[in-house]
């Protein structure tokens, strides 16, 4: 199981709420028809697509399209509309994935670790994992010195962190919509 927590690479004036991921036993998949799937696919490609253009492309009335999108939001299928900020454009061209393992004695501090680490400006996403690693952090930094400082000051200096492993990202390609 992977739980994703968004970091603070986005506009600091907007508070992003953390969602607690439910297990597959807790959630029944929403009933989606082909129109819903086309709407989701189009919004995945461009979340700013105007409702009239979305309705026209899908072949339904704008009022029907608006109602469909609202229903998908209400059902939790659409969890939000986000700005995808290019780290390079804001001076953070080096990206990495950092695997983090906590000390076994720190298991009760998982939530506080998440809240503390996701506030760091370099952290784009936090993945809470089941498996060999406890977390994977997706981070962006100015350069290797900035990345090293982040790891040393925020992870290695934390007594609750047992170890880390850093992998540099050469290229990030967005996947297809999961529909």
From Swiss-Prot:
GO molecular function ontology, one term from the record: sequence-specific DNA binding
DNA-binding region(s) in UniProt: 51-70
Activity-regulation annotation: The DNA-binding activity of AldR is modulated by interaction of AldR with various amino acids. Alanine, tryptophan, tyrosine and aspartate completely abolish the DNA binding ability of AldR. On the other hand, glutamate and asparagine reduce AldR binding to DNA but do not completely abolish it. Binding of amino acids can lead to structural modifications and changes in oligomeric association. Activity is also inhibited by 3 small molecule inhibitors, tetrahydroquinoline carbonitrile derivative (S010-0261), levothyroxine and liothyronine, which can disrupt the AldR-DNA complex.
Keywords: Activator, DNA-binding, Repressor, Transcription, Transcription regulation
GO CC field: cytosol
Residues of the HTH asnC-type domain: 32-93
Signal peptide start and end residues: none
Biological-process GO terms, alphabetical: response to amino acid
SUBUNIT field: Homooctamer. Homotetramer. Tetramer of dimers. The N-terminal DNA-binding domains are swapped, forming a dimer, and four dimers are assembled into an octamer through crystal symmetry.
Protein name: HTH-type transcriptional regulator AldR
Organism the protein comes from: Mycobacterium tuberculosis (strain ATCC 25618 / H37Rv)
């Amino acid at each position: 199981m992977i739980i994703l927590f968004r970091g603070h690479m986005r506009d600091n004036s907007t508070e992003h709420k953390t969602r607690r991921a439910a297990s597959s036993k807790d959630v029944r998949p929403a009933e989606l028809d082909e129109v819903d799937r086309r709407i989701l696919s189009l919004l995945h490609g461009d979340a700013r697509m105007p409702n009239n253009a979305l309705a026209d492309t899908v072949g339904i009335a704008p009022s029907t399209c608006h109602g469909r999108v609202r229903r998908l939001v209400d059902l939790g299928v659409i969890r939000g509309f986000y700005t995808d900020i290019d780290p390079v454009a804001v001076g953070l061209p080096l990206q990495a994935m950092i695997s983090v393992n906590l000390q076994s004695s720190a298991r009760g501090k998982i939530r506080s670790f998440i809240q503390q680490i996701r506030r760091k400006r370099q952290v784009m996403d936090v993945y809470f994992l089941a498996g060999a690693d406890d977390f994977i952090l997706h981070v962006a930094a100015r350069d290797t010195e900035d990345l090293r400082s982040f790891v040393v000051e925020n992870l290695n200096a934390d007594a609750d962190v047992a170890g880390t492993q850093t992998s540099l990202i050469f290229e990030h390609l967005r996947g297809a919509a999961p529909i």
